[in-house]
Curated annotation (Swiss-Prot):
<comment type="function">
    <text>This protein allows the phage to reside inactively in the chromosome of its host bacterium. This lysogenic state is maintained by binding of regulatory protein C2 to the OR and OL operators, preventing transcription of proteins necessary for lytic development.</text>
</comment>
<dbReference type="InterPro" id="IPR001387">
    <property type="entry name" value="Cro/C1-type_HTH"/>
</dbReference>
<dbReference type="InterPro" id="IPR050077">
    <property type="entry name" value="LexA_repressor"/>
</dbReference>
<dbReference type="Pfam" id="PF00717">
    <property type="entry name" value="Peptidase_S24"/>
</dbReference>
<feature type="DNA-binding region" description="H-T-H motif">
    <location>
        <begin position="21"/>
        <end position="40"/>
    </location>
</feature>
<dbReference type="InterPro" id="IPR010982">
    <property type="entry name" value="Lambda_DNA-bd_dom_sf"/>
</dbReference>
<dbReference type="InterPro" id="IPR036286">
    <property type="entry name" value="LexA/Signal_pep-like_sf"/>
</dbReference>
<protein>
    <recommendedName>
        <fullName>Repressor protein C2</fullName>
    </recommendedName>
</protein>
<dbReference type="InterPro" id="IPR015927">
    <property type="entry name" value="Peptidase_S24_S26A/B/C"/>
</dbReference>
<keyword id="KW-0804">Transcription</keyword>
<dbReference type="InterPro" id="IPR039418">
    <property type="entry name" value="LexA-like"/>
</dbReference>
<feature type="site" description="Not N-formylated">
    <location>
        <position position="1"/>
    </location>
</feature>
<keyword id="KW-0805">Transcription regulation</keyword>
<keyword id="KW-0678">Repressor</keyword>
<dbReference type="GO" id="GO:0003677">
    <property type="term" value="F:DNA binding"/>
</dbReference>
<feature type="domain" description="HTH cro/C1-type">
    <location>
        <begin position="10"/>
        <end position="64"/>
    </location>
</feature>
<dbReference type="Pfam" id="PF01381">
    <property type="entry name" value="HTH_3"/>
</dbReference>
Length: 216
């Protein structure tokens, strides 16, 4: 049973994220006095204030209300709060990621992009090329977008991944499909064929973010 008060959870999350009371108040749309009262459990946030507070503290409303530890990994990121900046590299560099000790020299890279997603320090951006991941309906990641690749995330069925096929110099971007013990790289565009992989492919990383970077 969690005996911690709601105010203590609010204060602990704020401290962990290194946010001042005044800054948190601006993010939520209340005064720093209100934040102080919440943290001392004199009053409690509810309704829209609770939702805004959970987003600012990157946790679920249930965690703040009840201390549900299973919800602490559910993050609510604000679009205006970057979690980090990562380099935009070439598809050739991405294809060499598995072999190189240092696949790219960060200090030599000019283009960096922010993300609101938590990811490993070795993550990198790639610019989407071609229309193989442009779908007629549903999820579609067309040319002109950039994708953030995290090499530390486990590639699971249904995840979008960047992989390197044997004999190819550049990496490729596809959806990983596992079916009856077989693995495939599936384009989101049905006009392109699926590629079965069976030891002839290395998964470089999992796509954890995507955004439009270049307007036509």
């Amino acid at each position: 049973m969690n005996t911690q008060l709601m105010g203590e959870r609010i204060r602990a999350r704020r401290k962990k994220l290194k946010i001042r009371q005044a800054a948190l108040g601006k993010m939520v749309g209340v005064s720093n006095v209100a934040i102080s009262q919440w943290e001392r459990s004199e009053t409690e946030p509810n309704g829209e204030n609770l939702l805004a507070l959970s987003k600012a503290l990157q946790c679920s409303p249930d965690y703040l209300l009840k201390g549900d530890l299973s919800q602490t990994n559910v993050a609510y990121h604000s679009r205006h709060e970057p979690r980090g900046s990562y380099p935009l590299i070439s598809w050739v560099s991405a294809g060499q990621w598995m072999e190189a000790v240092e696949p790219y020299h960060k200090r030599a890279i000019e283009n960096w992009h922010d993300t609101t997603v938590d990811c490993s320090e070795d993550s990198f951006w790639l610019d989407v090329q071609g229309d193989s991941m442009t779908a007629p309906a549903g999820l579609s990641i067309p040319e002109g977008m950039i994708i953030l690749v995290d090499p530390e995330v486990e590639p699971r069925n249904g995840k979008l991944v960047v992989a390197k096929l044997e004999g190819e110099n550049e990496a490729t971007f596809k959806k990983l499909v596992m079916d009856a013990g077989r693995k495939f790289l599936k384009p989101l565009n049905p006009q392109y064929p699926m590629i079965e992989i069976n030891g002839n492919c290395k998964i470089i990383g999992v796509v954890v973010d995507a955004k439009l970077a270049n307007l036509p």
